[in-house]
Amino acid sequence: MANKLVRGSLIIFIGNIIFRIGGYIYRFLMAILLGPTAYGILGITLPFQGIFQTLAAGGLPPAIAKYVAEYEAVDEHDMARQTIYTALKIMVFLGIFLGILMIFVVAPVLAYKYLGKPLALVPLQIVGLITPFSVIVGAFRGAFQGVYKMEYIVYTRAVEQLGMILCATAFVLIGFSTVGALWGTVIGYSLAAVSAIYIFKVYMPKYIPKPSENFTFTRRDELKLAGTLVKFSIPVIITA
């Protein structure tokens, strides 16, 4: 266990350094290619992107990691897998709901009334398209953390960042400006979501076997599990 923790911490530490550099490269490229006005609009959207991603995740990725680790420790593989599925349902619902809210309500209010910048409307609306993909990625990263496979988290982050940098740069060069930069982010997260699903289906059965045939889990059981996950996630989302 200690070796797993040390190895996982080292992988995440190295990954964070690499992705921090990647983040600087992204901002540097966008600052050069977009110019002051368009880059300023992009800068306006980034805080709201972070806020909505945090709200959509609902503090559930740490809850997934905690309960998956606990169930796996006592060989309750069916419950570990069910924890992931139940949390994923909650997160996808939140991601879609908050995405729609951002597109049709929050973005217009922010652009016209709060910021007074109509040009920021479409970029802010695109932020709403990011959340459904980001929550899928977050849920599976929580699952990967629960079985101490930190390298899987790094792989999905690499796909996310490379996709975002390459697509955003290409779209901006084509002439789509801030909108193109944000579409690059959408594509980056969508590719990361696909990679996370692929890793979960292909490689995770080694650590969390597929459900046994005699495993039964009623709607009432799922509601109880959902309540447990949400109860754990509330302090996480408040502090986030």
Regions found by a protein language model. Name each.
Residues 4-66, 99, 103, 165, ...:
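Signature of the first transmembrane helix
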Residues 115-140, 158:
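Alpha-helical transmembrane segments of multi-pass membrane proteins
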Residues 1-5, 196-240:
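Interhelical loop/hinge segments that connect adjacent transmembrane helices in multipass membrane
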Residues 6-19, 124-125, 129, 143-169, ...:
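Alpha-helical transmembrane segments of multi-pass membrane transporters/permeases
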Residues 97-116:
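Short membrane-interface helical motifs at transmembrane helix boundaries
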Residues 125, 155-170, 174-206, 211, ...:
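Hydrophobic alpha-helical transmembrane segments
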Residues 2-3, 34, 52-89, 110-111, ...:
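Transmembrane-helix boundary and interhelical linker motifs in polytopic inner-membrane proteins
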Residues 87-99:
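Selective transmembrane-helix segments that form parts of the transport pathway or gating/packing helices
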